[in-house]
């Protein structure tokens, strides 16, 4: 079965490049523009929770930031999913907050496709 990943980022460019990279590696991707949009998409996936392999999320987003989104996910029936956090060099201080909220790993932006795929494989196949 194809592994399904939810990608959450307010930048359409980042979402598209991540989706392209993941599609080329054989993953199915659903995109969300912020934490609120992602929660709505997760709710619509409730019946197929076992088809979702992981979540990749940005930290700084409008409406609902990544930390708040992670906290919501970890209190839901999706709590078992690994969550990979995107952060920029200037946001590295947020890594600890992400870990405390329940993130499983992180990738610093800008990233190379190989870095992203290595981090994804490490979490999906763990």
Feature-to-residue mapping (PLM):
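A Lys-centered signature of the CheY-like receiver
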Residues: 109
